[in-house]
Regions:
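Catalytic cores and adjacent flexible loops of soluble metabolic enzymes
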Residues: 1-218
Length: 218
């Protein structure tokens, strides 16, 4: 809180939702609970935003979980109430298995912001996820990778890497712009210099009727 960061936690069961709600700014539903109605209902019954991870889930299971949440939260629009996280539950995950197009797919299907829960070694999948429209990025963090045996350390980020990752992701997000095509203000000054113009192909006497053969482009 002193650093201005939101505190988010995952209830291990429905019994943990109420006590965690008193401490947290948001709750997260783990991938393993995508089909566990008691925890989803309890989280939806809270007043907090909920982040729902979708690792191992079929799209029909995601549909059911979203519908269950909506039926309990009773919000006409779920935006700002529920966020989905695309996730590949492998440790580490291979980048060719990421299927990051699931991010825009679920966004369009459910009308919700979708994020990426990263288990790929390195920042590349996170970069690509933001380029696909991910609004949240979740990564594992460790104080030290070297010499650690547990699987999560290899795919985790050390503190100095987090600063670089956040900087890169902010730059990528800023580069996306709007869903349109128009010249930027900075490049509009170059339009005339980049386009071709009409010139005479040779010197002409006064009164000459201009024909195609007299014209060149440069």
């Amino acid at each position: 809180q002193q650093s201005g960061l939101d505190f988010i936690s995952t209830p291990a069961s429905e019994d943990w939702v109420v006590p965690l709600s008193e401490l947290c700014d948001a709750l997260k539903i783990a991938s393993g609970d995508i089909d566990f109605a008691p925890t989803i209902k309890a989280a939806a019954d809270s007043a907090l935003p909920v982040i729902m991870s979708t690792g191992t889930a079929e799209i029909a299971e995601v549909d059911s979980a979203v519908a269950l949440f909506k039926s309990v939260r009773k919000a006409e629009v779920l935006e700002d109430h529920l966020y989905l996280m695309h996730c590949v539950s492998e440790y580490p995950a291979n980048i060719v298995d990421c299927n990051l197009l699931s991010i825009p797919y679920m966004r369009e299907r459910h009308g919700l912001d979708v994020g990426w829960s990263n288990h790929v070694i390195g920042p590349l999948a996170c970069h690509a996820a933001v380029a696909q429209g991910a609004k949240l990025i979740e990564v594992h963090v460790t104080d030290q990778k070297e010499g650690r045996e547990f699987r999560d350390h290899a795919l985790s980020f050390e503190p100095h890497e987090i600063f670089d990752l956040v900087s890169d992701l902010n730059s990528i997000s800023a580069s996306l712009g709007l869903l349109q095509k128009r010249p930027t203000l900075s490049e509009q000054q170059n339009t005339r210099a980049f386009r071709k113009g009409l010139v005479y192909s040779k010197d002409l006497e006064s009164g000459t009727v201009i024909e195609d053969k007299h014209i060149s482009f440069a």
